[in-house]
Amino acid sequence: MSEKQKKRQWHTPAERIMMTGFGVVIILGTLLLCLPVSSASGKGVYWLDALFTATTSVCVTGLVTVPTATTWSVFGKIVILGLIQFGGLGIMACMIMIFLVLRRKISLQSRKLIQDTYNLPVLKGSVGIVRRLLIGTAVVEIAGAICYSFWFVPHYGLWRGIGYSIFHSISAFCNAGIDLVGESSFAPFVTNPLMNVTTMGLMILSGLGFPVWWEVIEHVQDLLKGKRTRKNFIRGFTLHTKLVLTTTVILITGGALLILLLDWNHTGSLGDLKPGEKVMAAFFQSITTRTAGFETIPQKNFTDGSAMVSMILMFIGGSPMGTAGGVKTITVALLIVLVTSYIRGNHDTVVWGRKVVEENIRSAVVIFFFALTTALTATILLVAVSGHPLLDCAYEVVSAVATVGLTRSLTSQLPAAGKIIVILIMYMGRIGPITLAVALGRRTRHVDADIQRPEQRILIG
């Protein structure tokens, strides 16, 4: 293959590894879940339900066709937990973890794959970044499990309580939203501050993304050591961290306020709760729609207005290099900045005195368009094959493509064709935006960049 042909190649090893790696793990997970030992009855589970469960676990979505608590045996639940952890960390992080445990030397090619997978600006320190990611994940998941144990251990006994605490901590942090409580998810905990705060904390942390973690921690350390003052604490953040934190606060607060406004007196959702409980439930709904997919109030019980707000939040999702799905907060933030800059007559896209590179803008536009097109197409197909109401199907599709896992009681009622559609869009939702971001972020893929072509204006609007 000539150098010119290599430059024209779209797919990179990192992209192929991500796509095939997730696919292979889903297949292996399906085979394990099909075994009789994986089911609570000992008779095995229908292959399509096993495939659906493996896909929703690896893609950290949370939609399920069969109740997790009663369908699967202890072995089956361990398999699901392993798939969730793999899906949350990603194939490269898991591979590096194995190398570190076995004390194997990590090759230059593997380091390059890490750089491509996480879209890192430089190759140096890539393994260290993954190591910090793994350590950070372990610390937060252990802390979450300890918090959960204060409720699960007294109610389920020591060993079962510990197991449930670990399962739900990993599920919440990896944004899977799969639970062992029952068919009503976290509805029994709608008024429980401990379970709500713990779950919301895990979901927010994972949704922020690891780069934001590290930068905030470094700034706090500098502040404590006297290297940084309170005045320049926030100013010292990178543009990425500023955008993530600002967008996250606006989405969480704005979403909760809209849900409170729309459902304050609505029977079945917030109307049956006390004022303080309404606020807690609204914030939980606002956070879970962008991340994990646990629910303290059945989604079908919300008004159509709140359902639309939830769909928007699901579509946006979390932040880059986090475990949440969606088009990402940065994508939406850049599009908003692009529009405001255009309205103001600015040639460049500028935010907080910094010019955003054109490459990032193009990536944001393509990722947003890709996700929107996928959601619209899948909604049409799901309505056609299932015959269910448009809102329920659209909610299901957006939840799947954004890997959230919330449903308006539709997943278990889907026909085989509907389940296959949801399986495909869960996979596309987990792989698509990541692959596009990596692909569009590589400068080596500019085709014939040295050729100057004539410009021509076209009519718009």
Question: Where are each of the predicted segments found?
Answer:
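Membrane-proximal intracellular helices of multi-pass ion channels
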Residues: 1-461
